[in-house]
Amino acid sequence: MKYGKVSFLALLCSLYVRGSLADPESEQEPLVFNPTEVKAPLVEQFQGAWSERWIPSHAKRFVNGIEEMSYVGEWTVEESSGPGALKGEAGLVMKDEAAHHAISYEFDEPINEPEKDLVVQYEVNPEEGLNCGGAYLKLLAEPTHGEMSNSIDYRIMFGPDKCGVNDRVHFIFKHKNPLTGEYSEKHLDSRPASLLKPGITNLYTLIVKPDQTFEVRINGDVVRQGSLFYDFIPPVLPPVEIYDPEDIKPADWVDEPEIPDPNAVKPDDWDEDAPRMIPDPDAVKPEDWLEDEPLYIPDPEAQKPEDWDDEEDGDWIPSEIINPKCIEGAGCGEWKPPMIRNPNYRGPWSPPMIPNPEFIGEWYPRKIPNPDYFDDDHPSHFGPLYGVGFELWTMQPNIRFSNIYVGHSIEDAERLGNETFLPKLKAERELLSKQESMEKQSMHVDEESNQILEKFLDVYDIIKAKLPPNVAEKVDYYVETIIETPEIGIAIVAVLGSLTAVILTCYFYFFASSSPASLSTGTTEAEKEQQEKFKQETETEKIDVSYAPETESPTAKNED
């Protein structure tokens, strides 16, 4: 069957074009993971009995004292995968989409050495991307006893958080007011973007130093640094002085810098009553304006419904339509000139403003010592850290965490990153570059394909007008197939190499072996019966025919 031949050709062409655009990854020798020798209060690479160290939580989540939901999200440890994966490396994976997840690790002994650097570092890989969800961790202010939840207090929250256009890396710490004993959150004021991309690992590092400075690094690069005193909202230290809340502005205090000129007089020619808009005095009614014709008329084709009851429903009134005469002419009904801006409009008059001779200045309450003021030279003294917890919501599954470091050595954290992150960096960045390149190439190919298809249809419209009806009907089927499945259509066009050649090839392929009568405008009864049978077959097997092998049909037998 010739339709099968062309369909199979189209399929091969499509596969050929796809294959020519594909860029298969070259096979590379997998990198091998070696457990680090770095030591710290926490160096977690999820080897061995990880489930004895990390306890998933099944606690209830409460918001404003009301139970919201349970932490039902599943946690697993899985070997790394992807182009940059280290063979044998494992990571903690947040598995479920649209779910709350919570898990925690408790230190053998609380960490509380404020005279040393505090370094927090870990890797995050959103294997399927992260459009809305958190990937930050918390350094905990109390033991969890395996029941991590939003009610467990924390000292520091650090890491990426992304939802829609909000994309940032958090650094939040809690500071204790020495006067009241209360803790308040201090948020980093200018938060860097997370740089999260599907299947790409990022390394996040936080360094807090005893001199009250900090650094946030992403992939080893310092993206934010500053002072615990000056770069957080609200500030750590309250103001030394505040405005006196009991101070009152004197009654004779003049704080208006300008006043209306008391000597100004409204000009005699100032017309406050002049309208803002006036009819255009130069406008002329169009000659074809039908002033006696109504704009709307009853619809002459409207019919009273059969079930309309005048006694119950009232008098039936047909719907109205725009008067056709009004559409043909310039307009109908009473003609009015268009409105224009009044050149003489000036609006209400008001005297000009002049400097106020009695102006004293803007009034402020006097300053008094802040009764709530306190000083703290060491906001980096966060207090004892009892463990690490993840308490997260995510809309995407399979968020991977690996190579977690919590300790006091910047050098050791860098060494760990060199061992685990840098080997993945090159391979994953090559993948990212390849993905971006293929996306650009795909956009370019799609644009060219659309242009080719548009030209093809333009040429076909010209030729179709000269084709006999029975021929045009058959060719139409294939043109519709090209439009509905442009991959096949563009492949055929690309292989044949010429838009005109495509149409002529289709024409002669189908009809060169047919009898002259089949190209004439007349059609015999036998041919009509044959065409109707073919039409029914193609309609019932339309999906199958584009990928069907060559088969016989009554039409094919007659043509062969």
UniProtKB/Swiss-Prot annotation:
- Residue spans of the sequence repeats: 244-255, 261-272, 280-291, 299-310, 314-324, 333-343, 347-357, 361-371
- Keywords, ordered alphabetically: Calcium, Chaperone, Disulfide bond, Endoplasmic reticulum, Glycoprotein, Lectin, Membrane, Phosphoprotein, Repeat, Signal, Transmembrane, Transmembrane helix
Report the residues modified as Phosphoserine: S553
The principal location of this protein is: endoplasmic reticulum
Q: Give residue ranges on the Cytoplasmic side.
A: 513-560
Q: Where is the composition biased (Basic and acidic residues)?
A: 525-544
From the Swiss-Prot or TrEMBL record, state where the protein is found: Endoplasmic reticulum membrane
| Region named Disordered | 253-273, 517-560
Q: Which positions carry Phosphothreonine?
A: T551, T555
Is Calcium among the key words of this record? Answer: yes
Give glycosylation sites per the record: N418
Q: Name one GO cellular component term.
A: fungal-type vacuole
User: In this UniProt entry, which residues form the Lumenal topological domain(s)?
Assistant: 23-489
What are the boundaries of the signal sequence? 1-22
Among SUPFAM superfamilies, the record links this protein to: Concanavalin A-like lectins/glucanases (SSF49899), P-domain of calnexin/calreticulin (SSF63887)
> GO MF terms on file?
calcium ion binding; carbohydrate binding; unfolded protein binding
Which residues are an alpha-D-glucoside-binding?
Answer: Y136, K138, Y154, D161, E391
State the family it belongs to. Belongs to the calreticulin family.
Biological function: Calcium-binding protein that interacts with newly synthesized monoglucosylated glycoproteins in the endoplasmic reticulum. It may act in assisting protein assembly and/or in the retention within the ER of unassembled protein subunits. It seems to play a major role in the quality control apparatus of the ER by the retention of incorrectly folded proteins.
PANTHER family reported for this sequence: CALNEXIN 14D-RELATED, CALRETICULIN AND CALNEXIN
Protein name as catalogued: Calnexin homolog
| Protein source organism | Schizosaccharomyces pombe (strain 972 / ATCC 24843) (Fission yeast)
